[in-house]
A protein has these predicted regions:
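Core catalytic lobe of class I
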Residues: 2-5, 9, 13-14, 18, ...
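Cysteine-dependent PTP/DSP-like catalytic domain, specifically the C-terminal lobe
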Residues: 293-304
Length: 304
């Protein structure tokens, strides 16, 4: 197995909250390569962690119906010629996603970039709720800078059978735990002029979902998140599309609860599994590329 190369230069780069030289990173990766060469490809099963090496369409058949609370996955976009970057049959994928996700509370989060984002949305428009936009601190595609804007964002498509509005509370909403809220106790009053026809807050509605005009309510929190989320990329990465642990933890905490089950059916280097361990969730991971399965297994089990 050959991991990504690092130049011999001694230029320092920021990794999380500390700095390492490229020589230090190179040495660490050489040591990791030796460890992974001797690691078994056997599936890893424990009370809270299940890791499978194989094709996700096949391996997901082992997952019981209505047993997964959150699916968080960075599917192959099909934008490169790399062996691992082959688009999975979305129809087959949704057959399993629909079967195994809990309803109505379960949430499915899929990373994407255009034109793959449009493919994802159209693959299950009925369940599509909205897009989050991850803004990075670094741009990519510099070689195309003279021909098009450089990229600094990725989409996160949010799907669920459940609702995402107060009007759907009788039929059940998807899990949503907004992060970063600031407590406040502000008295406010409803009015038809202020609210208009769009009702998306439960405290505006009374019996039969009718507007309670001129009624008072207390706003308990402020600083609600918007659709743009900003997380720095990690420079010391091994997989080509590895996501920051802090970003994954944010998504896990927003769309699931402690003790619940999270699935990543193309887990790559295992960042979702690491995030689940850090946030006290159970994790099911699937990866067909042997070198990345070993890496995921190493990262996750050494983080327990």
């Amino acid at each position: 197995m050959e991991l990504n190369k690092v130049d011999d230069e001694t230029e320092e780069i920021t990794i999380s909250t500390h700095k390492k030289s490229k020589q230090e990173i190179k040495k660490e990766r050489e040591e990791l390569t030796v460890k992974l060469e001797t690691m078994s490809l056997e599936n890893y099963i424990s009370d809270n962690i299940s890791l499978y090496c194989g094709d996700c369409i096949v391996e997901m058949q082992k997952i019981p119906d209505d047993s997964v609370d959150l699916i968080l996955c960075d599917l192959p976009y099909g934008t490169t010629k790399c062996k691992w970057d082959t688009v999975i049959d979305l129809n087959e994928l949704w057959k399993h996603y629909r079967r195994i996700i809990k309803k109505p509370s379960g949430v499915i989060l899929l990373f994407g970039q255009q034109p793959f984002t449009s493919m994802l949305v159209s693959s299950n428009y009925e369940w599509f709720k909205y897009n989050l936009i991850w803004k990075k601190n670094k741009t990519t595609q510099f070689l195309l800078a003279n021909y098009r804007p450089m990229k600094c964002t990725e989409d996160i498509c949010v799907f669920s059978k459940g609702g995402a509005a107060a009007a759907s509370r009788n039929t059940g909403n998807m899990t949503y735990n907004p992060q970063g809220l600031i407590p406040t106790n502000i008295k406010k009053k409803n009015s038809k002029e202020r609210i208009g026809k769009m009702l998306n807050q439960e405290h505006h509605l009374g019996k039969n979902n009718k507007l309670i005009s001129n009624s008072e309510y207390t706003q308990n929190f402020t600083n609600y998140p918007n659709e743009l989320i900003e997380f720095d990329i990690e420079y010391d990465t091994i997989h080509e599309t590895q996501k920051p642990v802090k970003l994954i933890e944010y998504l896990i905490k927003t769309y699931s609860n402690e003790g619940e089950v999270v699935l990543d059916n193309t887990m790559g280097s295992g960042t979702t599994g690491v995030g689940c361990v850090n946030t006290k969730r159970k994790f099911i991971g699937i990866e067909k590329e042997e070198k990345y399965f070993k890496l995921s297994k190493y990262r996750i089990t050494n983080n327990l």
